[in-house]
Amino acid sequence: MKALHFGAGNIGRGFIGKLLADAGIQLTFADVNQVVLDALNARHSYQVHVVGENEQVDTVSGVNAVSSIGDDVVDLIAHVDLITTAVGPVVLERIAPAIAKGLVKRKAQGVDAPLNIIACENMVRGTTQLKGHVMNALADGDKAWVEQHVGFVDSAVDRIVPPSASATNDPLEVTVETFSEWIVDKTQFKGTLPNIPGMELTDNLMAFVERKLFTLNTGHAITAYLGKLAGHQTIRDAILDESIRAVVKGAMEESGAVLIKRYGFDADKHAAYIQKILGRFENPYLKDDVERVGRQPLRKLSAGDRLIKPLLGTLEYGLPHVNLVKGIAAAMHFRSDEDPQAQELAALITEKGPQAALAQISGLDANSDVVAEAVNAYNATK
C-alpha cells in the first residue's frame, strides 16, 4: 500500500506519518519546508520521542518526501492508495488544487483503483471541507469520476505534539505524548476498509468528534487562558494550580453532560475520560506553552469551536455552564504580542466593549443572559 501525507511538521511526522509507516505502508511526505524535505530524502528516517511514564525513542524508516507545490506530488496522487493531511485547517484550501490536478492525471491514466483521502486536522468534518475545495478546482467533466473512485473520509484526531527543541538540532526529531487517537468514518471509504493499527473505524464519527472537541480541546484552551491570566508558563503548571484545575474539570463536566445527553455516552466512562485528559495535561515530559495553546482566540471563541459550541449545548438542554462561562471570560482576556488574533480581539473589545465584541465573535445574542454572565465574569477577572 502506498500513501502520500501532506504536512511533514511535528504532527505529520509524530502522529499520522508514524502510524502509516509503522503499518508497513510505503509513505511519502509532501511539504514546502525544503530543510525538512532534504533531511527526509537524505536519511529516509527520523526519530520520535514518545514521552510518558516510560519514555521510548522510536525510529520511523523507509520514508520519502516531495515538494507539495511541484509536479512530483501530482504524479504521486495518480498512483497512491491513500492521501492524508496534517497541514492545519487554513492550509487545506491551498493544497486542494494539487490534489485536483493529481486526480485528473489519475483519471487520464486509467487508474480506477479506489483512492481514499483523510484530512487529519483539528476541526469538525475537515475532509468534507477539503472535498469542497477539491471539487471547486475540478472541471465539471471530472467530478463524476472523482465521486465514483475517490473516498473523502472524515476523521477525529487526538495527540498532543508540542514544538520541542531538539538537543541535537535535528530538524526531523519530534516529541509526542504516549496517548493517541485516530477515529475515521468507515461509511465514507471507497473499496476495502484499511487495516492500520492505531486507526479506529466508526459509523458514528460526530459523537467522537464532539467528545474530543468538548473535552480535550475545551479543557486545553481553558487551562491555557486561565494559566496565562495567573502567570503560568506551561499547561502542566496551570493544571497543577488547584483553582484553575477546579474550573477546567468543571467545564469538562459541563460539556460532558451535553455529550451524555446528545449521544448517550456512559457517565462513568466519560468521567474516566476526563480524568485521563487531566493526567495528559499534567505530563511532566511535555513542555506545552500556554501561549501556544491559547493562540487564535477569535477562532476558539467562534460558534462551532471548543468554547461556544459546548455552551450552546448547555443552553439547548437547560444544563449548568458556570465554568464554561469562566473559560470564555478568560479567553477574552488573552493577550499575546506573537498572535495577530489576540491583538485583534483586544482592539475589538476596546472599540465595542466586551458585550458587543463577544456577540460579534461568537454569534451569541448580545442581549442574552449568557452573554451577560460572560461579561460579568470578564469584568470580575480584570
Swiss-Prot record:
The keyword Membrane does not apply. Its EC number is 1.1.1.17. GO terms for molecular function: mannitol-1-phosphate 5-dehydrogenase activity. One of its GO terms (cellular component) is cytosol. The keyword Metal-binding does not apply. Belongs to the mannitol dehydrogenase family. This is Mannitol-1-phosphate 5-dehydrogenase.
